[in-house]
Swiss-Prot record:
Keywords: Cytoplasm, Translation regulation. The gene is rmf. The lineage of its organism: Bacteria, Pseudomonadati, Pseudomonadota, Gammaproteobacteria, Kangiellales. Gene3D superfamilies: ribosome modulation factor like domain. GO terms for biological process: regulation of translation. During stationary phase, converts 70S ribosomes to an inactive dimeric form (100S ribosomes). Belongs to the ribosome modulation factor family. It comes from Kangiella koreensis (strain DSM 16069 / JCM 12317 / KCTC 12182 / SW-125). It is found in: Cytoplasm. GO terms for cellular component: cytoplasm. This is Ribosome modulation factor.
Length: 60
């Protein structure tokens, strides 16, 4: 049985979320395609909010 790949946009969102938790700037977005870039930035914003609200302890 083949494993199904995750959706490209979901991966972009997750990578953005993790980048924010690691303290990376939103300027470091690796995606050039508009949809993927928007998802990455959305994930980055969520990650930044989670980081500032809960602190890093919740994610280590």
């Amino acid at each position: 049985m083949k494993r199904q790949k995750r959706d490209k946009l979901q991966r972009a969102h997750t990578k953005g979320f993790n980048a924010a938790l690691q303290g990376q700037s939103k300027e470091n977005c690796p995606f050039e395609e508009l949809n993927a870039r928007e998802e990455w930035l959305g994930g980055w914003r969520e990650g930044r909010e989670a980081f500032t609200t809960n602190g890093m302890k919740a994610y280590i």
